[in-house]
Amino acid sequence: MTERADTHVVLYDLGSSSADLIAAMCLGHMRVTVLEPDQADADRVRDVLQRRLPGAGFTVSTRLPEGCDVFICHASDAQMAPPASLVAVLDGPEALATAPEPDRSVAMDVLDPRFAEVAFGNAPDTTRARATRFLAKLNTGFAVTTRGHGFWGNRLQDAAISFVDRLLLIGITPWELDEALEDAGFAQGLLKSQDHIGLDVAFARRRASGTDLLVADRMVHEGRLGRSVGVGWYRYPGGGGAVIDPLMEDMIVEEARFAGIDPVPMTDAAAADAVIAGIINAAAGMLQDGMTTDGVDALAFYKLGLPDLTARAKQIGESGLRNRLTALQAVDATLWCPSPSLGLIFGS
């Protein structure tokens, strides 16, 4: 099936987390249907998306169309795809092993359309070409993921939030850490970024992998899902900009006390350096899996807002980074354990 000029894309049961993707598809002159099987969910998602994307041309529906060109969904919903459509599952390369129709399926991380990851699995050349044409219409660069569990961009995001969650528990506040991260070169604090994405997105990945985070998980359980609902790491009164929420500090202190985690003296700048060291350490595994340094830098920039990751690593130096990671093991021995692949960042 060749995509028409007005490529029709269906987003199946993705909620408001697809707002950035919808905006990019509208700019690419695609016809977008946001399909929410539950009427109450459809009404809620329509309200959120209309507020976030005023004037964007998309349809919210509860009815599955007879056909479409591209069907984007979670792997568990792939069987809902209309015949002959390209099926793009968001869960990661491993989801292709159980795809109902692997010949027309790819795995694609495209919710942040500035830079995508795609895994083709065993799809034929015709399916690969369709996926590539779709990404071209989005006007996005992309990296091809050939192996590994999950998309590397998501794994970097999840690792970064794990570092942040632990640092909050030892006494750093969310807004102080975000400010320090921006001072260190991040385009936006990681917690503000998570509010924009929606905390439920990473939470779903953690549930699937059996990973728990004390603060971030509690926030989701309490309905602090991010900007789309008006409260996450920050509050967004009237749908406006981020405002510090003093209740967050009380929640973090309570979680630390329950877990028996004592405060650790650390400056905000040192906390930001700890996050960056952890990200570099996590990124080393990407090189082991065949990613290029350019791909590593692109994913760190577009998924975390951190430019020039490999250059930052080389500026610290391999010995300096290992020493930094070793010292941070006093905060968490597992999170900051030096990767066996760390030397690849430095060409060793």
Regions inferred by a protein language model and the residue ranges of each:
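N-terminal glycine-rich phosphate-binding loop for ADP-containing cofactors
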Residues: 1-348
